[in-house]
Amino acid sequence: MNSIKFPVLDRTTKNSVISTTLNDLSNWSRLSSLWPLLYGTSCCFIEFASLIGSRFDFDRYGLVPRSSPRQADLILTAGTVTMKMAPSLVRLYEQMPEPKYVIAMGACTITGGMFSTDSYSTVRGVDKLIPVDVYLPGCPPKPEAVIDAITKLRKKIAREIYKDQIRPQQGNRCFTTTHKFFVVRSTHTGNYDQELLYPPSSTSEISTETFFKYKSPVSSHELVN
C-alpha cells in the first residue's frame, strides 16, 4: 500500500496572518450581534413568543431584544400602523444609531392589509414612513420565515460597503388623512406640523380682512350691480 504523505505545513509569517479590510471586519462584527427593537401593534407580533421559546431560540443568532431605540440597530415592525401611531414609529427610527435596519413583518405592515381597503386611518405600507431593508409577507409569517428574513439581512450586512451605509439625508415625511405625504422638518422634538395633519378648509384660508377691505360702507345695491 502506498503511504499517504501529508504536505509539510508552512509556518512562515506570510501564511499565519489573516488579511482583511476594515469594512469586512466591521460587517463581520455586526453579523452576530443584532439588537432588535420589537415594534408590534397587531396579531403578527404573537409569533415572537414562539421565537423566544426553546424550539426556535432566536438567541442563537445573537439577537438581543432591546426596549430602547438608542440601544438597537434593528427594528421589526409587525402589525397595522395607523396614522396616530406613525409619528411614534418615525421618532423611534430616528433615535436609533447608524447603521440601522428595518424588517417589515406581515401583510398589514407591508401594504396595510385588509384594514387599508376602506379605512382612512391606516398607513398603506410602513415604507412610506421609514426605509425597509427586508419584506416578510404573511398573515402571520411563521417563525421559520422570521429566521429566514434575519438570515437574509445578515447576508446583506456582509456585502455592505461603508460608503453605502452613509445614507443621504432625506426629509422626514408627514401624512394627511388622504394619504398624501409631505416633506417636513425633523421630528426629534416630537412635535408634528398640525397644519399638514389637518389641512385647513378652503373657507378658513380666506382671511377676515378680505371681507372688510372696503374703507367706506357699500350698499348691497352697489355690490349687486
From Swiss-Prot:
Pfam families found in the cross-reference section: Oxidored_q6 (PF01058)
EC number(s) from the headed UniProt entry: 7.1.1.-
GO CC annotations on file: chloroplast thylakoid membrane; respiratory chain complex I
Cofactor note: Binds 1 [4Fe-4S] cluster.
Membrane topology: Peripheral membrane protein
Residues where [4Fe-4S] cluster binds: C43, C44, C108, C139
Keyword annotations: 4Fe-4S, Chloroplast, Iron, Iron-sulfur, Membrane, Metal-binding, NAD, NADP, Plastid, Plastoquinone, Quinone, Thylakoid, Translocase, Transport
Main location: plastid
Molecular function terms, GO-annotated: 4 iron, 4 sulfur cluster binding; iron ion binding; NADH dehydrogenase (ubiquinone) activity; quinone binding
HAMAP family documented for this protein: NDH1_NuoB
Protein name listed in UniProt: NAD(P)H-quinone oxidoreductase subunit K, chloroplastic
